[in-house]
């Protein structure tokens, strides 16, 4: 009887240890601390001028990002590695009580790049010059925290978990021997650190993809006629395998929605 109890205790301990290990290796994305920056706006009152952008998301309305988006300065954009990240911003009413909406806040998704303008001083028009942390926000988002006539306001900002509806989506573009995969609707960290692809043919292994631009990842393999799986690692270290998310009948230009999402 004592022997059985001992075996049960060992099994229970091992099971608990495995569960604990899983929970510590895959933790939910947590918000960062607050930092100071500045914010302007662009794109018009309906944000129609924000479509496209350096992340490659295209139509932000149909992609689900809407009008709460922003172009990031060089210091924040990180050559596209920040595409899809979410930031909470609040206007610093103590620093600018005239143009700030005190107590208001808004969360935006990084969808574009705000290029530097070295012809202008960083504190007088060159708002996106390094090393300034600056957000050029879609106008509807900016007007939630600032008064239109102000034009530019001081802000406090921090990264926060992205909340998305549905699973991660993959749009396959390109041509033979050049698959360009746009990754959208990423929750939690919002941005992708690395990505791999595997075809469905027997013996196929995982092949590393590289960031082409923005949220677009490329492969130089010949994958036509194969079902595709992706192994995606977000910038917080979470990894998900999207097994068979793209069927063998895929064609360039199609988008495939998964049922899996980051936490």
UniProtKB/Swiss-Prot annotation:
GO biological-process terms attached to the record: plant-type cell wall loosening
Location(s), subcellular: Secreted, Cell wall; Membrane
Tissue: Expressed in panicles and flowers.
GO cellular component, one term: extracellular region
PROSITE patterns: EXPANSIN_CBD, EXPANSIN_EG45
Pfam family, any one: DPBB_1
Keyword annotations of the record: Cell wall, Cell wall biogenesis/degradation, Membrane, Secreted, Signal
InterPro entries, per the entry: Expan_Lol_pI, Expansin, Expansin/allergen_DPBB_dom, Expansin_CBD, Expansin_CBD_sf, RlpA-like_DPBB, RlpA-like_sf
Residues in Expansin-like EG45 domain copies: 52-167
Annotated Gene3D superfamilies: Expansin, cellulose-binding-like domain (2.60.40.760), RlpA-like domain (2.40.40.10)
Residues annotated as signal peptide: 1-28
Membrane-related topology note: Peripheral membrane protein
Domain Expansin-like CBD: 177-258
Family assignment from sequence similarity: Belongs to the expansin family. Expansin A subfamily.
Functional summary from the UniProt entry: May cause loosening and extension of plant cell walls by disrupting non-covalent bonding between cellulose microfibrils and matrix glucans. No enzymatic activity has been found. May be required for rapid internodal elongation in deepwater rice during submergence.
Protein name per Swiss-Prot or TrEMBL: Expansin-A29
Native source organism of the sequence: Oryza sativa subsp. japonica
Lineage: Eukaryota, Viridiplantae, Streptophyta, Embryophyta, Tracheophyta
Gene: EXPA29
């Amino acid at each position: 009887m004592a022997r059985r109890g001992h075996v049960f205790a060992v099994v229970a301990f091992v099971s608990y240890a495995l569960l604990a290990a899983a929970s510590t290796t895959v933790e939910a994305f947590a918000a960062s601390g607050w930092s100071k920056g500045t914010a302007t706006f662009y794109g018009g009152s309906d944000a129609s001028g924000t479509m496209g952008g350096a992340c490659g998301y295209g139509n932000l309305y149909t992609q689900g990002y809407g009008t709460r988006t922003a172009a990031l300065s060089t210091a924040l954009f990180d050559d596209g590695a920040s595409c899809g990240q979410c930031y909470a911003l609040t206007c610093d009413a103590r620093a600018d009580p005239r143009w700030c909406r005190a107590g208001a806040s808004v969360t935006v998704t990084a969808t574009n790049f705000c290029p530097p303008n070295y012809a202008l001083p960083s504190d007088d028009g060159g708002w996106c010059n390094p090393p300034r942390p600056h957000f050029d926000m879609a106008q509807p988002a900016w007007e939630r925290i600032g008064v239109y006539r102000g034009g530019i306001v001081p802000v406090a900002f921090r990264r926060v978990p992205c909340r998305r509806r549905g699973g991660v989506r993959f749009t396959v573009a390109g041509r033979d021997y050049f698959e360009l995969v746009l990754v959208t609707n990423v929750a939690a960290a919002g941005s992708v650190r690395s990505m791999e692809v595997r075809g469905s043919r027997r013996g196929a292994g995982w092949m590393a993809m590289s960031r082409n631009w923005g949220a677009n990842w490329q492969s130089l393999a010949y994958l036509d006629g194969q079902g595709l799986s992706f192994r995606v690692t977000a910038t917080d270290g979470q990894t998900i395998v999207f097994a068979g998310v793209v069927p063998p009948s895929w064609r360039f230009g199609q988008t495939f929605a998964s049922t899996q999402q980051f936490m």
